Amino acid sequence: MIIKPKIRGFICTTTHPVGCEANVKEQIAYTKAQGPIKNAPKRVLVVGASSGYGLSSRIAAAFGGGAATIGVFFEKEGSEKKPGTAGFYNAAAFEKLAREEGLYAKSLNGDAFSNEAKQKTIDLIKEDLGQVDMVVYSLASPVRKLPETGELIRSALKPIGQTYTSTAVDTNKDIIIEASVEPATEQEIQDTVTVMGGEDWELWINALAEAGVLADGCKTVAYSYIGTELTWPIYWDGALGKAKMDLDRAASALNDKLSATGGSANVAVLKSVVTQASSAIPVMPLYIAMVFKKMREEGVHEGCMEQIYRMFSQRLYKEDGSAAEVDEKNRLRLDDWELRDDIQEHCRNLWPQITTENLKELTDYVEYKEEFLKLFGFGIDGVDYEADVNPDVATDFIAI
């Protein structure tokens, strides 16, 4: 079939398998061009491995460090009539390309929050790798099914205490609007912590540790975003921020546990990037369009792949073997360039000046839209979008 982008809300409901593969190839090419990561781990588990930072982590480990990788994710396959999710095609492309280079790559597809996912992953590690040296936790899900009760818990992207009103961009109509978001209830705050906090990361690491599949010196990292006062009301000071603070709590508990065998647990605070997750957060698209333009001008712009390669090579697995620099909460900070005073001051001053008329001129809004479509495999150089493609891509993912 010939597949074109169809946008609904902040989701593109179609995906292009060839475009998704081209995306993965681009990230692999970048990683190889940077050269090998000297002290990289050799057996890596990535929970949430099919898109965004999780996918880039798997690529950095495999193509930057020569690691055997296991990926866990929840994606839908395509059929002859309907494309699957972008993450499905990303993961399929990754496996194919890794194996072509003689790298071990296996994936489990299903609910990563479930007990079954953890057990099947443990079984696979025991069977094929023995143990793992690194666990990346990169789940971004709006819903979590509690394994014990089957209850569905939903997160809320809302402020706390009062209604938040701000300038935002309507990405469907490309116009500047005033967006208001009602505050979260106590229950919604608790639920957001349950879905997006550190509990499931702890459950994963504890299950892996109890099964004896974590090697001595195993490092684990989970991803977070803090941002600046421009986004704090909806993010760090909102329900989502409470969940991210819970991630810090979990990191501290896990670090105590893993340090006994020479390992570590850290939250890595990353920069804002265009992902399906960030596009759903009110105000983020406009902020990203502003900050990207300034960071590009300053020569410090990074996408997912650049950030993660820097995290591996300059933080966790440095060439001289020295310990990673961390902040006062033991976090790895890769948002350091985004948070530079000159960059943030530029955004603060620009924010009130943005109108529908000057949006494309004063920000990287056009590039934001292009990057968004790229997530789904569209608008990529060298891909023939008039060609007939089969959305039914064969894989040997292990069903959870």
UniProtKB/Swiss-Prot annotation:
Pfam families given in the database record: Eno-Rase_FAD_bd, Eno-Rase_NADH_b, Enoyl_reductase
Enzyme Commission numbers on file: 1.3.1.9
EC class of the enzyme, as a word: oxidoreductase
UniProt entry tagged with the keyword NAD: yes
Domain of life: Bacteria
GO biological process: fatty acid biosynthetic process
Catalysed reaction equations from the record: a 2,3-saturated acyl-[ACP] + NAD(+) = a (2E)-enoyl-[ACP] + NADH + H(+)
Gene3D superfamilies: NAD(P)-binding Rossmann-like Domain
InterPro entries in alphabetical order: Eno_Rdtase_FAD-bd_dom, Enoyl-CoA_Rdtase_cat_dom, FabV-like_NADH_b, Trans-2-enoyl-CoA_reductase
Chain residues that bind substrate: 225
Pathway in which the depicted protein is active: Lipid metabolism; fatty acid biosynthesis
Annotated positions binding NAD(+): 48-53, 74-75, 111-112, 139-140, 244, 273-275
Keyword Oxidoreductase: yes
Keywords: Fatty acid biosynthesis, Fatty acid metabolism, Lipid biosynthesis, Lipid metabolism, NAD, Oxidoreductase
GO molecular function: enoyl-[acyl-carrier-protein] reductase (NADH) activity; NAD binding; trans-2-enoyl-CoA reductase (NADH) activity
Positions marked as site (Plays an important role in discriminating NADH against NADPH): 75
Active-site residues from the entry: 235 (proton donor)
Function: Involved in the final reduction of the elongation cycle of fatty acid synthesis (FAS II). Catalyzes the reduction of a carbon-carbon double bond in an enoyl moiety that is covalently linked to an acyl carrier protein (ACP).
Family annotation (PANTHER family): ENOYL-[ACYL-CARRIER-PROTEIN] REDUCTASE [NADH]
Family: Belongs to the TER reductase family.
Subunit note: Monomer.
Record's protein name: Enoyl-[acyl-carrier-protein] reductase [NADH] 1
Organism: Vibrio vulnificus (strain CMCP6)
Gene: fabV1
